[in-house]
Amino acid sequence: MAAIGMFAPVGAFALTGETAGAALSRIDESDVDHVCVNDHVSFRVGAGSDALVNAAAVLTHYRLLPCHVALYLLPLRHPVTVARQLASIAELAPGRLTFGVGLGGDDRHEVEICGADPRTLGRRMDESLQILRALSDGESIDFDGEFFTLHEARIVPAPAPRIPIIVGGRSDAAVRRAGRFGDGWLGIWVSPGRFATVTLRIAEHAQAAGRSPDGFAHALNVWCGFGPTRTAARAPLEAAMRGFYQMPFEPFERYSPYGSPGEVAEFLQPYVEAGCSAVNIIACADRHEDPVAGVAEVRRLLAPQPKAARTHEHVFS
């Protein structure tokens, strides 16, 4: 059974202030399994939001709601400071964060203004993941790499339980990276057949690295449009994707379902059958409340088991 989550209405996905808070409350009150947050420093026109700041805000306000970072531009940050951020979040909300990471090379300028070289993002990511995994045990580490040199680096207390790291990307290098360093893969713009093939290859890469793929969890980010007709559902989806990516919608359309919740669920079912354990929906509709209702209905259709009630108490109360 796949967990069905949706992106929080923050940052570049468009709601602010009281409207965003109300939408997050609707997500928490619904049968949606988890909330997702995205990450950009300065994308295209300068847009963005810090995924770990937003994750901390969500996790401390809603005591039982899990949060998936899907995904975080890890090569644009220093891995030791990220390890501290993750450890701090784990203290506040143990076991409720899933940490997805990716290169974020779609906007070369964003990478450059963060002081990174777009040509070396992959190697930088590999070193960052090695450091994150080593620091997650709470032991002192030394590291001598191309980008990072550490002597007796340590982060305590270590996250307990360990925060799963899901590696995103469509390239062969990303697939190898997921097997070598991740706890699963995060796909986007992929067919169900390709999804199944990639997960098998990740298992092979994990075994080649001396790791067991047992327990790996693979996820899918997917843009979806909801509305009373397919035409009505397509319009807000197309507008949102054009605005975010600054590109035409048509090349993405075959991977981006729209229509009724039933039509969206029918589109997603083959991914669940292909081994997807978490579907992260970027939901678009003409009315703010419609995306939450649409995703909740998709969840009911794909995973009909009811959820336990949640509390709205603040974590510090």
Question: Can you annotate each of these PLM segments?
Answer:
Residues 1-317:
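Active-site-adjacent structural elements that line small-molecule/cofactor binding pockets in enzymes
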